[in-house]
Amino acid sequence: MSVEIITHLGTVDPVMKRLVAAAGPLAIESRDDHSPYEVLARAIAHQQLNGKAAQSILNRFVSTCGQGIFPTPAALLALEDAALRASGFSFSKIAALRDLAAKTMSGVVPVRDVLHALSDLEIIERLTAVRGIGRWTVQMLLMFQLRRPDVLPVDDFGVRMGFQLAYGLKRLPAPQVLGLYGARWAPYRSAAAWYLWRAVDLSRAGQLPPCLEAVQLPRLPRKRRKAARKPPRRLKRVAVSAAPRAPTGVRTRARRPPARRSRAPKKKK
């Protein structure tokens, strides 16, 4: 399968072909074998925190609230907010965890076997219904837990940075542009994303091959292009005199204001 993927990427994209040769064999490894509920709960814990701080919170959560085992959805819903706060969760994350637990018990977030039977789009639609879970989080689950082969996380900063570096661009590509360009990598866009992540590492090590082609990025339709652009800056208002200026070298007579007519005093009767 890896040979088939590399052959396909090299056939449809010469820049990707050189990147694959520099990065070496594809190595997308499964991160863990947790249930979708636990994967998403851990993702919520990691939001806006570094890995060490998030893992410390999860360790306290498992030890104090689950007696060494990750709490089930029912057990999480039975916990008081004070217990979750003592573990280190913020109020917004507590609300997200409770919503995740409730939707897991109702079947919106299915077990792994049911999840495998759904398409990528169906999984994204169902899991992003959970509070605090966005498209990127679900795409990471698709790539690393479910090993789906055709996922391109266009909003991922590392993927966009890798594309900019590998393709010799002056700026980061817009997510919509990256999505349109990356359509040629299907049905192996997960592998392409992995190689774009590797492009960042190769660039830091000074081993990234230069882009030899003039890459033509797809143009967005007019409505999307306007949305992708930055809002225009507001121009400062400059006071302009209402009186027109005379051309250079032309003498003009200054206009005097009209004289006010004085009324004659009324005669006394």
Locate predicted features.
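Structural motif
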Residues: 30-38, 88-91, 182-189
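Hydrophobic (often cysteine-bearing) scaffold residues that line and stabilize catalytic clefts
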Residues: 37, 41, 50, 54, ...
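Alpha-helical scaffolds flanking conserved acidic
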Residues: 35-39, 75-78, 123, 178
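Alpha-helical ds-nucleic-acid-binding substructure associated with the helix-hairpin-helix region
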Residues: 3-4, 15, 22, 49-131, ...
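C-terminal accessory module of base-excision DNA glycosylases/AP lyases that mediates lesion recognition
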Residues: 1-28, 120-121, 135-269
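Generic alpha-helical structural context detector
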Residues: 42, 59, 63, 98-102, ...
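Short, surface-exposed helix-loop/turn micro-motifs enriched in polar/charged residues
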Residues: 29, 37, 53, 68, ...
